[in-house]
Amino acid sequence: MLAPSAEAQYGESELVQMGLESLGMWPDFAAQLERESGVDVDLRRQGTLIVAVDRDDLEWLRHAQLERERLGLAARMIDGDAARELEPHLAPTIPGAVWCPDDHQVDPRRLVQALRSAFEKQGGRLLEGVEVKGVQIEADLAAGVELATGVEALAPTATVIVAAGAWTRELTGLDDAPRVRPVRGQMLAVELGAPPLCEHVIRAPDAYLVPRSDGRLVIGATMEEMGFDPRHTAGGVMDLLVGAWEALPAIHDAPIVEMWTGFRPMTIDSEPVMRRSDSVANLVYATGHGRNGVLLTPLSARRIADLVRTA
């Protein structure tokens, strides 16, 4: 999701501004990436609907809306009837919502496919299925990348970008690695149906629902401090399904087509780390993007490219 308005939280004004800047870059970024890769990343601009499922939720939404207004975000309160005009399958008991018309979404799987294709078409070499153990440091310079199969030596002019996500601190040789921890997210997808169960991204108190062009309705996502445990849990899946059903009861009979887990790379302050290493001259960190990695893709690419060029 590309949703800086919907995901705005107290105490994260700097992160919100980064998100807005990156969101503004997305249309041109997506168009260029699609031209270079030949892959449609499914950029959609339908907006996000944040729904309350009861009166207590509605009061919380009103309170949170004050912060969005303070930040000047494009978001407004609407009543339940107006919400159902946007999404007719919403529960009849929904008392109100916040409408964020400027939020977008993109398919992250297609995005990765497009980035890979563009990278390789421009001469990049991608090593797959090879575990990275760490970075070999010699005389305060990154001299090689340690793989499970051996050391990949680097040219003297090379710059290493550490973009290892939640696994950043698992790499050896990085004494100043940022403090990044994994936060597990369980997700699932059901059949979107025809006509589709929804057209917009819907955020409920305990789940969000994202319609995809490939016919899936993605439902996510838990946030769990469980290390790198990739398993699904009955409670996690139940919470997602109940949270989604409270907002969109029509999912009740939708077939489940997929379940998966991922690990968000979270920092203490929830802000990403995009900087040079303090101790290794030719090493740059790009990690800790948490729940905003896809949103911040264009901005991160530009900032990291600037760091590499000026290294």
Residues covered by each model-derived region:
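C-terminal lid/capping helical subdomain adjacent to the catalytic/cofactor pocket in oxidative enzymes
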Residues: 77, 278-311
